[in-house]
């Protein structure tokens, strides 16, 4: 996010504090419960799920309502959002409302979908450490797919960051150090998440 967008976002928080007019500044939308991966720690049963997603019109109407309420940032997640054929339309609609739009992805479908998603303000790619640790958590070949996605995003001037779920497996194998080194080398941001127990 650019400095000016951050400044504008901070201004909205200050305005809400002064006016006491609260609204959801940031909203995460789970646009699908389907996923093409079966990560070992995932709490959802998303893998190869054969269910219908809410239709495009549902999301566009919801985005209209969020815009009217004053929402400034919409974060698209899943499952794997790129399994939706209309993801480009949803992104364009959010951006057309002047809102910031971010998305999470496992990276598999990014190269094939880059034209639909390059208007995003940022793309967050799942990456859990070096190839061995990552693929142990996410499945064979996922590390290379994630790196491909990061490189495609960078070539298309799409700000990208990695999202790492910290587990005993990858922490003991130097995941944090590997990700930070890779981020410096290639040039992307990184965030780290802890597993939490589902209740």
Locate each region found by the language model:
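Conserved radical SAM core fold
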Residues: 81-83, 107-114, 124-140, 166-170, ...
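Conserved C-terminal portion of the radical SAM core fold
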Residues: 30, 69-75, 95-102, 121-122, ...
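Short N-terminal secondary-structure initiator segments
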Residues: 66, 70-73, 128-146
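Secondary-structure boundary/capping signal
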Residues: 39, 50, 131, 142, ...
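Distinct, well-ordered alpha-helical segments
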Residues: 88-89, 111-118, 174-179
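Conserved non-cysteine loop/helix-boundary elements of the Radical SAM core domain that shape
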Residues: 47-58, 79-85, 134-150, 168-179
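Conserved alpha-helical substructure of the radical SAM core
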Residues: 2-113
